[in-house]
Design a protein with these regions (language model features):
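Outer membrane beta-barrel strand-and-loop segments of large Gram-negative receptors
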Residues: 1-3, 7-9, 112-118, 124, ...
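Signature of Gram-negative outer-membrane beta-barrel scaffolds
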Residues: 1-83, 94, 105, 210
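Residue-level signature of outer-membrane beta-barrel architecture
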Residues: 12-17, 22, 66, 74-77, ...
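Short loop/turn motifs that connect adjacent beta-strands in outer-membrane beta-barrel proteins
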Residues: 18-21, 81, 134-138, 191, ...
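Transmembrane beta-barrel strands of outer-membrane/channel proteins
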Residues: 26-32, 86-90, 108, 129, ...
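Surface-exposed extracellular loop regions of Gram-negative outer-membrane beta-barrel proteins
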Residues: 34-48, 76, 80-124, 144-168, ...
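C-terminal beta-signal and adjacent terminal beta-strands/loops
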Residues: 92, 237, 246-262, 278, ...
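Gram-negative outer-membrane beta-barrel transporters
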Residues: 145-148, 167-256, 348
Length: 351
């Protein structure tokens, strides 16, 4: 079903120095969202079954949410090359995403705020240490954060997602939290530039009606994330690019058994998101040749050769479970992936 909403907001902030070593940044945002007709809003019982409904005509405004979102940041300058930064922010999200994690399905649905789906609100604090080396050639940082979330959403068990006009009845809400730390080093000058980062994180949810009310991994919980990006300028015309990424596999829910009811096979699942897909990683390489690098030339262009996923890693996109044709009592898993190695050529120009 289609849902319509109008979101508006206003923000103001300020930055000021406190003596010679402190910088204070603060601000506040006022956000408002209105659901707008045409549309039909259903009322549901505790099991997600529709009870009755209200119809709104085209242009009707209903169900307004208003929120204040403060931000606060403090920078402590230890010396000319290092600093400590801390921050707090409240964020309200009026459009939420719910993901069907069963068997690694990539099926995601976006939900605007409505009488049945409240806006997600989060409070986040962060603390980091930042240090520059070699006259700013290298930038390093170590930063940690903690976030608490209210009104996080997820689907019920065995939710019907396709062509379901009562889809909001399949949504449950609860709390969530995440925390982690990121280590980064960046080189900004010289022929070789780029950055490398490692992030360790944890993301959890606790939603009544899901996983027996016990905490479980959020769909985006990926404890380890590594990124390495480099660019080497051989001269004004020729440059090379290198990117390697790695991430822990996405949490998924796999069936561990099945039973038959009225000639229908019903899968039996484990706890929510208790399995993981295979880890994701790939290497990308590129070569760029620039024409007409002279600043006086109005017409400039470049030719780029790139290879996506150089070593042809088959990163899983979807895992489905199927029964053998000759023996339906035997079930096997089948993995689907989108892209293996993918070379490309791009010509760019500007004038």
């Amino acid at each position: 079903p289609n849902n319509y909403a109008l979101e508006s907001g206003i923000y103001m902030g300020n930055e000021q120095k406190l003596g010679t070593q402190f910088i204070l940044k603060y601000g506040i945002r006022l956000s408002i969202i209105n659901n707008v007709g045409p549309g039909t809003i259903f009322n549901f019982d505790t099991e997600g079954n529709p009870i009755d409904s209200t119809v709104y005509e085209n242009g009707d405004f209903f169900n307004t949410y208003v929120a204040l979102e403060p931000r606060l940041g403090l920078v402590y300058l230890l010396n000319e090359t290092s600093s400590i930064k801390s921050s707090y922010s409240k964020n309200v999200q009026y459009i939420q995403q719910a993901q069907n994690s069963t068997a690694g399905s990539p099926f995601n649905i976006w939900f605007p705020t409505s009488p049945n789906v409240k806006p997600q609100s989060s409070h986040q604090v962060a603390l980091g240490y930042f240090k520059n080396f070699n006259d700013g050639m290298f930038e390093t940082s170590l930063e940690g954060y903690y976030k608490s979330i209210s009104n996080a959403i997820d689907f019920r068990d065995h939710a019907e997602l396709i062509l379901n006009k009562y889809l909001e009845g399949e949504v449950l809400s609860g709390t969530g939290w995440s925390y982690g730390a990121e280590l980064m080093i960046k080189k900004t000058t010289g022929k070789l530039s780029g950055w490398a980062s490692y992030t360790w994180s944890k993301a959890m949810r606790k939603i009544p009606g899901i996983n027996s009310g016990n905490p479980y991994r959020a769909p985006y919980d990926r404890p380890n994330d590594i990124s390495i990006v480099a660019n080497y300028n051989l001269n004004e015309k020729i440059s090379f690019g290198f990117t390697w990424v790695y991430a822990t596999g996405q949490p998924v829910t796999f069936p561990v058994g099945r039973f038959e009811y009225n000639n229908t096979i019903i899968p039996v699942y484990t706890d929510r998101n208790s399995f993981r897909m295979l880890d994701y990683h790939r290497l990308d390489l590129s070569f760029t040749y620039r024409f007409n690098v002279n600043e006086d030339k109005r017409w400039k262009s470049d030719l780029n050769f790139s290879i996506y996923n150089v070593y042809n890693r088959k990163n899983p996109y979807l895992i489905s479970f199927k029964s053998e044709i000759d023996n339906t009592s035997i079930t096997y898993a089948e993995m689907t992936y989108l892209f293996g190695i993918l070379p490309s050529i791009t010509y760019n120009f500007k004038f």
